Curated annotation (Swiss-Prot):
Signal peptide: none annotated. It is found in: Plastid, Chloroplast. Its cofactor is Mg(2+). Substrate binds at N123, T173, K177, R295, H327, S379. GO terms for cellular component: chloroplast. Pfam families: RuBisCO_large, RuBisCO_large_N. GO terms for biological process: photorespiration; reductive pentose-phosphate cycle. The disulfide bond which can form in the large chain dimeric partners within the hexadecamer appears to be associated with oxidative stress and protein turnover. The modification N-acetylproline is found at P3. Belongs to the RuBisCO large chain family. Type I subfamily. It comes from Magnolia acuminata. This is Ribulose bisphosphate carboxylase large chain. One of its GO terms (molecular function) is magnesium ion binding.
Length: 475
């Protein structure tokens, strides 16, 4: 073919590089109910206009590339491209902007969190025109939500399975997290459950190591569960971590847990991956297992305020992928969490409909159209003196998880569990009687400790423990 011959596909095609904003910045665009909406915190490189930066994000996370290509003429860019439809400055921050981007629903595979994230955040975060980029929030349209199964069971079904109502659930992470033999590990589980806890937990990095292979751990923990249930008359559980190096091995562990008749298994959803997590969630629903989710590795992604992905987005993704519990910070313990922001994504986990509320970091109204809710788990450096605040902040639909705050009791694991259960029951009773947990919390705990020697001992041990550090994300 002669170099001068013009094909139909090349009509109107002009090679070269053009500004993203000419195609992808569309402030006149009216968003559709079926669009996935994203709010990005954008920090452009010096000299890059915010409109160009926002348009670049929209382009590189949808149909764009660095140059004009002739195959653009073979499809409808207007139908498939992402659009930066609004930009606003971030108050109090120099050269930072919130760029709002709308994505057509046809860009995403149904029921795949993996594909959604691959498109929206898979490539654009290394873009040279940006100094930093953070995904602050997503609006998932109802049409897309309905393609997901979501949590295996949800909050109400879990309460019915456990026959426990009107209070937060109590848990404990077995410590030391690594090094115990399976038999000693099972003994610690039994003591905690016998003392009054609802759940005990594998730590996130307990998988199948030389000192404790997974099958041995599962067997001894199942024995502990059944023994504690027989003695207390309550349904008990232990989060058996099924996370493994392959999906096949993960499923083998989940199947063995089901055969043992235990109520719940666990997965590290970020290190394990969304595809593995969704696979496990589907199995758990089909086989009556609850699924506890640990967020190991989240701070690598969400801790910095100007780069990464906010945890509220990871929480939404988990609700879509599937999990009945997820760790959500404490506000009061050793791990970071601002109260209003934390409660914002806690509501996104539990509630069916959440209104836009920028004061709590919620950029979009979200309708989950009856997708089951997820119980937030508060854990990390908490003890009995935190119980009133935790009960007030998280409410009944939560799991309060005390690791060192149970196993660090001077009299042992079972008395540590007793102390936590007594403290919780005292706080719930006081709240139900109309007392203010925020102002009277310490008094409520002291009153309960007068008739519970286990609680009195715990109060004495942890009376001066505080975690007061400056947040590193101010750097």
């Amino acid at each position: 073919m002669s170099p001068k011959t013009e094909t139909k596909a090349s009509v109107g095609f002009k090679a070269g590089v053009k500004e993203y904003k000419l195609t992808y910045y569309t402030p006149e665009y009216e968003t559709k109910d079926t669009d996935i909406l994203a709010a990005f915190r954008v920090t452009p490189q010096p000299g890059v206009p915010p409109e160009e930066a926002g348009a670049a994000v929209a382009a590189e996370s949808s149909t764009g590339t660095w140059t004009t290509v002739w195959t653009d003429g073979l499809t409808s860019l207007d139908r498939y491209k992402g659009r930066c439809y609004h930009i606003e400055p971030v108050p109090g921050e120099e050269s930072q902007f919130i760029a709002y981007v709308a994505y057509p629903l046809d860009l995403f595979e149904e029921g795949s969190v993996t594909n959604m994230f691959t498109s929206i955040v898979g490539n654009v975060f290394g873009f040279k025109a940006l100094r930093a980029l953070r995904l602050e929030d997503l609006r998932i349209p109802t049409a897309y939500v309905k393609t997901f199964q979501g949590p295996p069971h949800g909050i109400q079904v879990e309460r019915d399975k456990l026959n426990k109502y009107g209070r937060p659930l109590l848990g404990c992470t077995i410590k030391p997290k690594l090094g115990l033999s399976a038999k000693n590990y099972g003994r610690a589980v039994y003591e905690c459950l016998r003392g009054g806890l609802d759940f005990t937990k594998d730590d996130e990095n307990v998988n199948s190591q030389p000192f404790m292979r997974w099958r041995d751990r599962f067997l001894f923990c199942a024995e502990a569960i059944y023994k504690a249930q027989a003695e207390t008359g309550e349904i008990k559980g232990h989060y058996l971590n099924a996370t493994a190096g392959t999906c096949e091995e993960m499923m083998k562990r989940a199947i063995f847990a089901r055969e043992l008749g235990v109520p719940i298994v666990m997965h590290d959803y970020l290190t394990g991956g969304f595809t593995a997590n969704t696979t496990l969630a589907h199995y758990c629903r089909d086989n009556g297992l609850l699924l506890h989710i640990h967020r190991a590795m989240h701070a690598v992604i969400d801790r910095q305020k100007n780069h990464g992905i906010h945890f509220r987005v990871l929480a939404k993704a988990l609700r879509m992928s599937g999990g009945d519990h997820i760790h959500a910070g404490t506000v009061v313990g050793k791990l970071e969490g601002e109260r209003d922001i934390t409660l914002g994504f806690v509501d996104l986990l539990r509630d069916d409909f959440i209104e836009k509320d920028r004061s709590r970091g919620i950029y979009f109204t979200q309708d989950w159209v009856s997708l089951p809710g997820v119980l937030p788990v508060a854990s990390g450096g908490i003890h009995v003196w935190h119980m009133p605040a935790l009960t007030e902040i998280f409410g009944d639909d939560s799991v309060l998880q005390f690791g060192g705050g149970t196993l660090g009791h001077p009299w042992g694991n079972a008395p540590g569990a007793v102390a936590n259960r007594v403290a919780l029951e005292a706080c719930v009773q006081a709240r139900n009687e109309g007392r203010d947990l925020a102002s009277q919390g310490n008094e409520i705990i002291r009153e309960a400790s007068k008739w519970s020697p286990e609680l009195a001992a715990a109060c004495e041990v942890w009376k001066e423990i505080k975690f007061e550090f400056k947040a590193v994300d101010t750097l």
